[in-house]
């Protein structure tokens, strides 16, 4: 186990460990990879990482640009997986040890064995069975939430919080937005309370962040909602450039801002 920043003492520390100990499998978080994405790519080339067979990433949504970058850099399977502290093991992933399946960047995969994952309407509890319909990710019993059986010896609070938040049915709520495509791959869109209401349009921050992160000069981004007298809320993005030298002048910064806005408008619409 390595405990520390992926850039200390330098941005090659992960890869030096892989080379020294002939590491075959790694597990980390997407943020650590995004930190490395900002560094000089030559660090990865200084070490022999041929022993590495796969990289697992979890703990937060893995955006498609980051997944694509690390996949290209390592040329090994990048295995996203989605779970919660309460569940104790993955809800969504690709169990390639049982059945080989194609990775889709941006998706943690399909429901693990034993999990009956549903996409449901937050207002009615109706199950959304069509492809790419956005709803709350819920799970039928008895498997969830795994190791968690109550909340501070308050059984009623446990049931009301986790099992009765979706109207009209007893269903474990992950409190995450998600969609499922036509092939059964799930995409997690962020927390249900992490939503911006722009002129009556409910927008998930993760959707906006992933759109911005697709720009080649954006390494990291966070989106929050701020108050606006006209629209109620508007989205504000805080971004870290991959190459700050390209933003030395106000003209360059304005140009990047216009490019980012155009990217979001193209992918999500001008409302974002």
Question: What positions do the PLM features span?
Answer:
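ATP-dependent adenylate-forming carboxylate-activation enzymes
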Residues: 1-17, 202-208
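Gly/Ser/Thr-rich phosphate-binding loop
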Residues: 15-16, 23-28, 37-105, 116, ...
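AMP-binding/adenylate-forming catalytic core of the ANL superfamily
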Residues: 19, 26, 144, 168-170, ...
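Glycine-centered tight turns that cap/initiate beta-strands
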Residues: 51, 75, 114, 157, ...
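Active-site glycine-centered loops adjacent to acidic/histidine catalytic or metal-binding residues
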Residues: 59, 83, 109, 176, ...
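Short, P/G- and charge-enriched loop/turn segments at secondary-structure junctions
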Residues: 100-107, 161-166
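Conserved ATP/PPi-binding loop(s) of AMP-dependent carboxylate-activating enzymes
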Residues: 110-114, 125-164, 201-203
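Conserved beta-loop-beta connector loops within the AMP-binding
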Residues: 118-141, 182-183, 247-257
């Amino acid at each position: 186990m390595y405990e520390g920043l992926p850039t200390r003492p330098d941005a090659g520390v992960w890869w030096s460990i892989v080379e020294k100990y002939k590491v075959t499998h790694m597990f980390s978080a997407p943020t650590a990879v995004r930190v490395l994405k900002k560094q000089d790519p030559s660090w990865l080339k200084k070490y022999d990482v041929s022993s590495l067979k796969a990289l697992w990433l979890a703990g937060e949504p893995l955006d498609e640009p980051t997944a694509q970058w690390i996949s290209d850099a390592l040329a090994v399977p990048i295995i996203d997986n989605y779970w919660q502290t309460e569940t104790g093991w993955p809800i969504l992933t690709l169990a390639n040890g049982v059945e080989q399946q194609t990775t889709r960047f941006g998706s943690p995969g399909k429901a693990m064995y034993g999990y009956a994952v549903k996409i449901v309407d937050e207002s009615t509890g109706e199950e959304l069975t069509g492809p790419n319909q956005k709803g709350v990710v819920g799970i039928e019993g008895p498997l969830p939430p795994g190791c968690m059986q109550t909340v501070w010896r308050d059984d009623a609070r446990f049931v009301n919080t986790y099992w009765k938040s979706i109207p009209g049915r007893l269903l474990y709520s992950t409190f995450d937005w998600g969609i499922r495509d036509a092939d059964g791959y799930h995409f997690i869109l962020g927390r249900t309370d992490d939503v911006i209401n722009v002129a009556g349009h409910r927008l998930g921050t993760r959707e906006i962040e992933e759109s911005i992160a697709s720009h080649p000069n954006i390494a990291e981004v966070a989106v929050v909602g701020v108050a606006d007298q006209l629209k109620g809320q508007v989205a504000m993005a805080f971004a870290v450039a991959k190459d700050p030298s390209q933003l030395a002048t106000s003209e360059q910064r304005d140009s990047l801002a216009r490019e980012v806005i155009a990217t979001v408008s193209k992918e999500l619409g001008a409302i974002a």
